[in-house]
Amino acid sequence: MDTDVTSTDNFLKLKRILQNFQSERINRTYKDIEADPEFAKIGNFFFKKLYASEDFSFRDTSMKKLHKALDGKIYKNMLTAVTKVIELHEISDAQDNLMVKKMIAAGVEDSITMEQYQKIYVSLDNYDQRIYQINLSAEVTRIFHGLSKKWIVAVSLKTVKTAAAMFGIKEIVDFIYDGYVSFKTIDNIDFFVDTMVQRELSWHNEIWSTITGKTA
C-alpha cells in the first residue's frame, strides 16, 4: 500500500515550517490589535491559540469527534457553529497541504522565504477559494460572538466540560470554552471582524498583484 505523502516525516516538517511562517505573519499583521486592552482576550485567543502553529493536529482531529459527541447534547445553534469551524479548519488544512506539496516540488527544505511563499501561494490558482476562506473566518467569528451572549450556551458548555474527558474531547472543549470566554468580553465585534477582513483581503491581493502584476 502506498504511503500517504501527507503523513511522511518530511511533509509534516514542512507543514510545521509553513504554519510557523503563517503564524508569524498573523502576529505581525495584528500586533496593534493584540496590544489593545479592549481586545486583549480575544486577540490572545485568535492569534495565539486559533492561529498558533502548535496543536493544529489535535484541533483538526478532535473537531469531528466533538461534533459527534455533542449531537443532541448541546444547544443546537452551538453545534451549527462547530460545523462551521470544522469547515474552516478543513479548508485551511487542505490549502496548507497543497502549499506543502508545492514546497516539496520547489525544493524547500528548512525554511521558506517570503518570495517562495508568495510564488507558491499564487501557483495554486485558487483566488476565489482564498476569498471564501477569509469570509468564512469572519462568519465564524460573528456566529461565536453571538452565541457568547446567550446564557444557554454557557450552561451547555459547562455541562459538556464535565463529561468531556469521558468522550475523549477535553482538549477541544477547553479550547472552545476559552474562545467563548474571550468572545464574551467584547460587546461589539464589528471593528475586530472588519479589521480582520480588510487586512486579510489586502494581504491576499498584495500577494496576487506582486506575483502576477495584476490587481484584483
Model region roles, listed by residue range:
Residues 1-61:
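Leu/Val/Ala/Ile-rich N-terminal alpha-helices, chiefly Sec-type signal peptides and the beginnings
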Residues 151-216:
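Alpha-helical oligomerization segments
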Residues 122-125, 132-149, 155-158:
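Short helix/strand-capping turn motifs
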Residues 39, 43, 59, 63, ...:
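Short runs of predominantly hydrophobic/aromatic residues within well-ordered alpha helices
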Residues 34, 54, 128-129, 143-152, ...:
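Short acidic, glycine/proline-enriched loop segments that cap or flank alpha-helices
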Residues 43-131, 140:
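Long amphipathic alpha-helical segments with strong coiled-coil/leucine-zipper propensity
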Residues 87-94, 132, 136-139, 159, ...:
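Charged, amphipathic alpha-helical oligomerization/scaffolding segments
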Residues 19-22, 26, 47, 51, ...:
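Alpha-helical repeat scaffolds in large eukaryotic proteins
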